[in-house]
Amino acid sequence: MPESRRLTDGEIRLARSIFGNHLDYAAVRICRAPKWLTAAVSPNGSIYYPAPHYLDDFSQAGTPYQIWLIHELTHVWQWQHGFQTWLGGLLLWMRGGYLGRRAYHCPALGRIGSFAELNMEQQAEILASHFAVSAGYRPASAEELGQYRRILDAFFHQSGGNRPLPRYFARICPAK
């Protein structure tokens, strides 16, 4: 059994700025992944960070770690609301999505019709980028802020039967 812990109060505060009440924070586990795992994964509602990146409190770490936490918590949100992240990741891998990180590349914000049309990694990237902007870690133009509001409207106004979960076979953008 890997070393694991619950979210800290600071991590919950960070997460609430994006996920509000749409995550069961008490159910989230942060785990130290086996040594052979070199990337963070969230296949089952828990987050497994590679050993060198497992921290006692991501809210006390630098900005890149906080953004990474939001990315991984997006997969926990997906899992908690019925999207099988292990299957989504497997399908992306089978389609070459992790070669050159293609699965993470998002279309220009103006070309995204809705949050739900994105694959699981694109959703995580959009929420992590929005977090970076809203927390003041990265500047954004008024137009960019408006695009984020438009894309994330369904996410921020989700309800029990209306969750903008990713598509298993969403498009994969070409490598940049």
Language model feature labels by segment:
Residues E3-Y25, R29, S46, W86-K176:
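Metalloprotease/metallohydrolase-associated module, dominated by Zn2+-dependent proteases
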Residues I30-T38, S42:
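Mature, structured domains enriched in cysteine- and short glycine motifs
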Residues N21, A39-A40, Y49-I70, F83-W86, ...:
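Short pre-active-site segment immediately N-terminal to the catalytic Zn-binding motif
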Residues P43-N44, T63-P64, Q122:
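A conserved catalytic-core signature of glycosyltransferases
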Residues E11, L69-L73:
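Structural preference for long, well-ordered alpha-helical segments in enzyme cores
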Residues L73-L91:
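Catalytic Zn2+-binding segment of zinc metalloproteases
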